[in-house]
Amino acid sequence: DCFDILVNFENINIYAPLSYGDKKYADSIKHIGIARFGNKFIALESFMRFDEYIAFLNNIDIAIFKQNRQQAMGNIFVLLALGKKIYLDSATTHYDFLTKLGFRVFDIANFNLEPMLEVDSMHNKNLLLKLYSKEKQIENQRSFYL
């Protein structure tokens, strides 16, 4: 599905994290990706150190999460903190969760390569800090136990 969305775009590189999960599935994704996109498809098959992975995420422009289950929320939150444009399937619980919180994420049905507006990027960064700051976490823990 995701590959069908990207096939018509020329000046892109596609990075596919395949270092976790089922190896057979990862191999099939790699094979299909290379067949459809050639050297524009880069399979990430080994784990990176945390600092390397954050640097990698900081260098991408757009992230697409085309799964129907709530997965990769840690990556999504890091990408929000980095001000990246995130596409999700609007029929998923994580799309619903994030939009109800007020994050500006995008429906994959409307995919384009337009850059993230700075105002949207800053909104997401500030909202993330507001909702998940150390102070907010302490407040949440206190209210839970009182």
What are these regions, as identified by a protein language model?
Residues 44-56, 92:
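Conserved active-site histidine-acidic residue motif and adjacent donor-binding/catalytic loop
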Residues 85-88:
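Short hydrophobic beta-strand element within catalytic cores of glycosyltransferases
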Residues 1-12:
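Short hydrophobic signal-anchor/transmembrane segments that target glycosyltransferases
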Residues 114-146:
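A charged, aromatic-enriched C-terminal amphipathic alpha-helix characteristic of glycosyltransferases
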Residues 55-68:
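Acidic donor-binding loop of glycosyltransferase active sites
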Residues 28-47:
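Nucleotide-activated donor-binding/catalytic signature segment of Leloir-type glycosyltransferases, i.e.
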